[in-house]
Amino acid sequence: MPMNRPLRTAPLLLLLAACAATAPREDTAGAPPATTAATPARSQASRAEIALAPASASLVSGKLTAVPMGAGVHLAGEVGGLAPGAAHAIHVHEKGDCSAVDASSAGAHFNPDGAPHGRAGQGPHHAGDMDNLSADARGVARVNAHLTGVTLGDGGARDIAGRAVIVHAQPDDYRSQPAGNAGARVACGVIRVVR
């Protein structure tokens, strides 16, 4: 019988060795799905430029930059040719088309959620809504606006790359639907990714 003992314990040792070689399973119930070739990760552009050109026979023009920042996109720059000391509405519009003389080709405000028009940061509003610009005595306004919940160049539904920025003749009243009673479109520029 001493010869049978190693034969009886050999299968038991193999079973124990196989169990020990199995890696422990991690709990993945709350983890996000792994990125595969079928679902690539979306990355944002690092910068876009907006060259605002006159519309509706105005003399308004300017240059803005857009960069991803926090949970949104930050717009900065300068707009000139505005009525001195006046407020002017500025919005991101749904189409990157400034070909119409009155910039109507840019469509409505960028509004992927179907929200009512309002004031950014104060309740429901379009994703493209921003606070009014304030022109100085020379008719120049500095833009320093943050659009929360939008992206830049990732191709998603909330991406503002390829859309247009519009400056209006009047201030936005933040109440009137669908566009804040902001008057004529006096400048238009497409948000173009540069890197």
At which residue positions do the language-model features occur?
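Sec-dependent signal peptide hydrophobic core
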Residues: 7-14
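N-terminal leader/targeting pre-sequences
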Residues: 2-6, 20-195
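C-terminal motif of bacterial Sec signal peptides marking the signal peptidase cleavage site
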Residues: 16-18
